[in-house]
């Protein structure tokens, strides 16, 4: 087998596909430890762990939102939509990715070749656009609280979440259109392997445009918008800390701390997404601009696998980051998994008024309004 025939490059899934798993079928110029079939079985096992952990976390998160009425607020709806997108990716794309290390050909036919890339890009779009919407929601709650509309707020957010899904699917349509099966003939054994490629019949310009457009639309532009939102959020929180009014000081401090916690949670989600998907985008760009070459170095092979696994890991870490950052979600998570009774929600009452302090993703009653004094302005809001 020729050197360039050892691995088949698939730009869509960003990793190498072994043309022949058995180390006895060819004299491969790689380390025997890595070419041993047992090593290739470890990779699908890692995929299996990621899928299992992701299923547990995301299904539990969605179940909490669906079954616990008090948890159905604006941020939680966005986070549930995020979990649904991650769940879709883990159920469909992750097993397909893992199968490439166990088989030497594409197993899912022409329909699967068009459907899997479509689902994958839809899920990525849902993730990054939902994070952008969450950041915008935190910006509005902290910087422009007077703009919050209490009436039909949850319904409006449902429509926004649905719009994000529609936009993500529309942007993923080209993946389904251009992806197709591609025959790969190995002259030494006179065998033909079938692979799934996003643009099997195009020139070198197409992958360059595709990789750069994906990097900009699904990474750079959304994260830039999020950065602008968080600049103004940080600026407002710093100003609020120095401009607290004398009256109602304790209540305002509590509300600022509440919003800081939720803003921190969203920022952690954004950071995890940026960290997990950057290597995948970088490798995709590298391959697209070296489309006519096949890098068969072990460093590139290992880096590609790690980048791919890291990208799928992003679909399972959010529920557990939420578990660590939110006491209320941690309580509900333990209730769902350990079948224990949730604790009572304690509200503080004073003469002639009742105040509910809403914390990060904390259970709230939509019928209870909260009056706040932020930067000297009295605002009325129902969702934080």
Swiss-Prot record:
Entry's Gene Ontology molecular function annotations: G protein-coupled peptide receptor activity; neuropeptide binding; neuropeptide receptor activity
| Coiled coil stretches, renumbered | none
Carries keyword Signal? no
Localisation per UniProt entry = Cell membrane
Query: Which residue numbers carry lipidation of type S-palmitoyl cysteine?
Result: 339
Sites of Phosphoserine modification:
350
List, in alphabetical order, the GO biological process terms annotated in this UniProt record.
G protein-coupled receptor signaling pathway; learning or memory; motor behavior; phospholipase C-activating G protein-coupled receptor signaling pathway; positive regulation of behavioral fear response; positive regulation of respiratory gaseous exchange; psychomotor behavior; regulation of cell population proliferation
Any stretches that span the bilayer, and where are they? 39-62, 77-96, 115-136, 153-174, 209-234, 265-285, 299-325
Question: Which cysteines link up through disulfide bonds?
Answer: 113-196
Regarding tissue, the record states:
Highly expressed in pancreas. Also expressed in stomach, adrenal cortex and brain. In brain, expressed in cells throughout the cortex.
Q: Which residues lie on this side of the membrane: Cytoplasmic?
A: 63-76, 137-152, 235-264, 326-384
Q: Give one Pfam family, short name only.
A: 7tm_1
Sugar-modified residues = 20
InterPro entries, from UniProt? Bombsn_rcpt-like (IPR001556), Gastrin_pep_rcpt (IPR001966), GPCR_Rhodpsn (IPR000276), GPCR_Rhodpsn_7TM (IPR017452)
Identify the domain of life. Answer: Eukaryota
**Residue intervals annotated with topology Extracellular:** 1-38, 97-114, 175-208, 286-298
Cite the entry's keywords alphabetically: Cell membrane, Disulfide bond, G-protein coupled receptor, Glycoprotein, Lipoprotein, Membrane, Palmitate, Phosphoprotein, Receptor, Transducer, Transmembrane, Transmembrane helix
Q: How does it sit in the membrane?
A: Multi-pass membrane protein
SUPFAM superfamilies referenced in this protein's UniProt entry, alphabetically: Family A G protein-coupled receptor-like
UniProt KW Transmembrane keyword:
yes
Give me the Gene Ontology terms describing cellular component.
plasma membrane
Role: Receptor for gastrin-releasing peptide (GRP). Signals via association with G proteins that activate a phosphatidylinositol-calcium second messenger system, resulting in Akt phosphorylation. Contributes to the regulation of food intake. Contributes to the perception of prurient stimuli and transmission of itch signals in the spinal cord that promote scratching behavior, but does not play a role in the perception of pain. Contributes primarily to nonhistaminergic itch sensation.
Family per UniProt? Answer: Belongs to the G-protein coupled receptor 1 family.
UniProt name for this protein: Gastrin-releasing peptide receptor
